[in-house]
Amino acid sequence: MAKTVKKSGPKKAKRNVPNGVAHIQSTFNNTIVSITDTTGEVISWSSAGASGFKGARKGTPFAAQTAAEAAARRALDQGMRQIEVLVRGPGSGRETAIRALQVAGLEITLIRDVTPLPHNGCRRPKRRRV
């Protein structure tokens, strides 16, 4: 019988990063929260799908809240205290994700909407008739 060998993968070194930037990408189908340092290197990330939600439930505000809490918890372990929040996209989880970051214990210094707006680019999808 073969012995089971426990592999220890590359562990990310714990760094002390006092302030950073939270990037929240909120679409109609999912919400992705990435917390970076000021240079743009990712400290922690989470998404509604990574938090255990599947299908249509990934687009809900509660899924966005859960994803933001998970990312904030990992960022707090790295020593983060203050963040700027950059929000992108039209999804329903935008405000909930920001509130979850604040409740988790991160001090929000700035909230900026960086949703890209086309200057008459691609044609929009046709209107849904339900």
Swiss-Prot record:
Belongs to the universal ribosomal protein uS11 family. The gene is rpsK. Signal peptide: none annotated. The keyword Ribonucleoprotein applies. PROSITE patterns: RIBOSOMAL_S11. It comes from Synechococcus sp. (strain WH7803). GO terms for cellular component: ribonucleoprotein complex; ribosome. NCBIfam families: PRK05309.1 (NF003698), uS11_bact (TIGR03632). InterPro entries: Ribosomal_uS11, Ribosomal_uS11_bac-type, Ribosomal_uS11_CS, Ribosomal_uS11_sf. Located on the platform of the 30S subunit, it bridges several disparate RNA helices of the 16S rRNA. Forms part of the Shine-Dalgarno cleft in the 70S ribosome. It comes from the Bacteria. One of its GO terms (biological process) is translation. GO terms for molecular function: rRNA binding; structural constituent of ribosome. This is Small ribosomal subunit protein uS11. Part of the 30S ribosomal subunit. Interacts with proteins S7 and S18. Binds to IF-3. Keywords: Ribonucleoprotein, Ribosomal protein, RNA-binding, rRNA-binding. The keyword Ribonucleoprotein applies. It holds the Pfam family Ribosomal_S11.
